[in-house]
Amino acid sequence: MATIFFAEPELVIGHGRKVLFLNPGDLQIFKEIELPPDLTTCGLKTVEPVPAPGHPASSSKQQPAALKEATGSVKVEVSIQNVTYSPDRQLLALTTAGQKAVLLYKSRPENAQLLSIRPLARASSALRFCSDGSSVLVTDKTGDCYQYDCVEVDASPRLLLGHLSIVYDVLWSEDQQYIITCDRDDKIRVTNYPATFDIHSYCLGHKEFVSGLAMLTEQHIISASGDKTLRVWNYTCGKELLLHELPAPAVRMLVRQLEPEKTYEVAVLFYDYVDAIGVYRLEQTTTESWSITSTQLVRAEAGTWNICNFALTDDRIYVTGAENERLTLRVYDSRNGERASGLPEGWLKMVLDNLDVAAFMPEDLSVWFKKRFDNVSEYLERKKRRIEEQKQQKCG
């Protein structure tokens, strides 16, 4: 998986065992984090499996694959899954696959300093710091959401809530009263915090997976979905305020606040469409009224390579994807959608050489869509044939 995002003034790219920090103007690397091949060498603690009561201790041959991975008897390749900054940019959290862990770094002033490394139960799907950076939320692919303390950095995680399907994004309100999650089963859930056993509200209306969430105001969020819609909600009461039709399913969403206040730029990565990215201008007209005032579609040479992620700045769109099963990056002008000019010669080779990229296959996003089975039509067809056969027998 390749992750990329822009956090003023840095462009951050994570892939394999490295995180690169670039100046978005000249694309020069000024800092990097490299993980070791074995995370136990930097402090990841393993847990020995506990045999069932009355059962003899299992041999290594009898241990399930997951337990072999935890005890280190099977070597797995470490790869970065998600990366995010705290709001004040003082902390950076990242999660890994292979040896599943969440790592917390002090990111300032110069070189990143590892503060803690704690095991994850399952592969992560999203990361989000709280507003004061005192803890970070990690959601996983089975629907659970854990809280990791960033003050007591060695504290065990706390399970806060769970969904019945994979959680694709998570938000934490500025006042830390609500945790907002979205999942593959088209639901947006608003959960009270710290009493996370109490669900405050739902934002219902999407017909497919909800791939992204973003906070707009203290009471409003925007969501993107595989049902080809953008929607704005008052999440405190679960009320839909805007539904905007998209030309294709949305699999990634980024939101930037513009001037004047309550004006936003919303960028959406489409699934399998002739134009790869849609850029929309969103404005709040009254307290409970929103509108899309402009639309720009960016082709980004869709169809010639497999696009998987992107980052947005004031004037550029940075896109990652696969070409001939190799990771690559392309930069486009956000004003006209054309390839960006004025980039330093050799920048792409420099970045890819630093990432030491091997074969790269983006995630198969087709599995995000629900599988629908129509047993009724088949039943009715069989019933129709049976009735016709019975009529023929009577006539014969």
Curated annotation (Swiss-Prot):
Pfam families hit by this protein: WD40
Pathway as given in its UniProt record: tRNA modification; N(7)-methylguanine-tRNA biosynthesis
Signal sequence coordinates: none
Disulphide bonds in the chain: none
InterPro entries: Trm82, WD40/YVTN_repeat-like_dom_sf, WD40_repeat_dom_sf, WD40_rpt
Cross-referenced SMART domains: WD40 (SM00320)
UniProt keyword terms in alphabetical order: Cytoplasm, Developmental protein, Differentiation, Nucleus, Oogenesis, Repeat, Spermatogenesis, tRNA processing, WD repeat
GO cellular component terms given for this protein: cytosol; female germ cell nucleus; male germ cell nucleus; nucleus; tRNA methyltransferase complex
Keyword match Cytoplasm: yes
Tissue: In testis, it is present at high level in hub cells, a niche for germline stem cells of testis. Ubiquitously expressed in all testicular cells throughout spermatogenesis. Ubiquitously expressed in all germline and somatic cells of the ovary.
Superkingdom of source: Eukaryota
Reported function: Required for the Mettl1-dependent formation of N(7)-methylguanine at position 46 (m7G46) in tRNA. In the Mettl1-wuho methyltransferase complex, it is required to stabilize and induce conformational changes of the catalytic subunit. Required for binding of nanos mRNA and repression of translation by the mei-P26-bgcn-bam-sxl complex. May cooperate with mei-P26 and nanos to derepress the BMP signaling pathway. May cooperate with mei-P26 to suppress expression of a subset of microRNAs. May cooperate with mei-P26 to regulate bam expression levels in germline cells during gametogenesis.
Similarity annotation: Belongs to the WD repeat TRM82 family.
Name the record gives this protein: tRNA (guanine-N(7)-)-methyltransferase non-catalytic subunit wuho
Organism of this sequence: Drosophila pseudoobscura pseudoobscura (Fruit fly)
